C-alpha cells in the first residue's frame, strides 16, 4: 500500500457507472410517476447518508422498494409524511431532522414558520432541508437563527448516492486522536495537508466540518492501494 500526502483529486468527474453495473439512465427508468420516483430516490439517499454519518437508521427504510414506497406514500407524497427524524448512534439523545420543502420559493417567512413548527422537537441537534426551489440570500441567512446547524441539499443532488459510484475511493473519517497521531507521524500541521473544501460534494455528504481529516484510499490495479489524507477547509 502506498501512502502519500501528495495532492490527488478526490472528486473527479467520472462516467456514471455503479457497483451493480448500471448507470444513471438505467437507474432512473420507470413507468410510474416521476414525482414519486424523485422523492423515493432522494429519501433513500438521505437515509443512506444519515447512516454513513453515524445515525440509527432502520434497515427496512434502506431496503424499501419503489413500489413499496408508492403504496405507503402514493404518487404525490405529502411532504410532512416524508420527514425523517433519527437519533445519533453514539448519543441517542441527539437527533437530526430531514425536511422536504415544497416547490414554492423559500423566503424568510417560510423559514420562520418552519422554525416555529419544529421548536418543540426535543433533542434536535441538526437539520437538513431538501429543496425543490431556490432559497434567496435572506432566507439562507435566516437559517443561522436556528440553535443548530441547518444544511440544504437541492433534491437533484440526492437522486443518486455519489458514494456508490464504482470509481469512488474509500473514505474514512479520522477521529481527534487518529488525526493527532497522523500529524505527529509526519511532523505536520493540519494546514500543511492537502485539502478538501466544505462545498465538495463528498464533504457535504458526510457532513464534515473544518479541520476534520479524512483518509482516502484508491484501489489501483495492479499496483495495489494508494492512500492520501485531506483536511477540510
Curated annotation (Swiss-Prot):
Component of the RNA polymerase V complex. It comes from the Eukaryota. GO terms for biological process: DNA-templated transcription. GO terms for molecular function: DNA binding; DNA-directed RNA polymerase activity. SUPFAM superfamilies: Eukaryotic RPB5 N-terminal domain, RPB5-like RNA polymerase subunit. Expressed in flower buds and siliques. The keyword Nucleus applies. It holds the Pfam family RNA_pol_Rpb5_C. The lineage of its organism: Eukaryota, Viridiplantae, Streptophyta, Embryophyta, Tracheophyta. The keyword Nucleus applies. Keywords: Nucleus. DNA-dependent RNA polymerase catalyzes the transcription of DNA into RNA using the four ribonucleoside triphosphates as substrates. Component of RNA polymerase V involved in RNA-directed DNA methylation-dependent (RdDM) silencing of endogenous repeated sequences, including transposable elements. This is DNA-directed RNA polymerase V subunit 5C. Its main location: nucleus. InterPro entries: Arch_Rpo5/euc_Rpb5, RNA_pol_Rpb5_N, RNA_pol_Rpb5_N_sf, RNA_pol_subH/Rpb5_C, RPB5-like_sf. Belongs to the archaeal Rpo5/eukaryotic RPB5 RNA polymerase subunit family. Disulfide bonds: none annotated. One of its GO terms (cellular component) is RNA polymerase V complex. It is found in: Nucleus. The gene is NRPE5C.
